[in-house]
Amino acid sequence: MNNPTVAQYTLARLSQLGIDRIFGVPGDYAFSIDDAAEQVPGLEWVVCANELNAAYAADGYARIRGAAMLTTTYGVGELSAINGVMGSLTHRLPVFHLVGMPSERIQIQNLVTHHNLGDTNFSRFLPIAGAAAGVTAILT
């Protein structure tokens, strides 16, 4: 990959750690992550029926393989996965939860979009989802 995106680089590095599957549900804000997964050699994109199932699948994978990746979309997706993600944290399982967010352009222009509460507080869900994470970071 010449000039990889942040998503491609992140997924490639996690793949180098031996994680060969990423579990999740396609979502419009996560399409860049979903597309990047298709570009990483040896990484299988496992599409799940819903975000909670994806989180539980990642939890099970981490129990067997040592670490896992999960991807969801902003807001409704990340909140739907939270019970599985919190369970992984409780059992000290390294599950990397990658959440696709509205673009910088949308955030800078303060555009009201779907998956929010009718306002432009794009970090509203970070404290909630972040409580289920060992570490959080916003990558652009």
Residue locations for each model-derived region?
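N-terminal alpha/beta PP-like core and its mobile active-site loop of ThDP/TPP-dependent enzymes
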Residues: 1-140
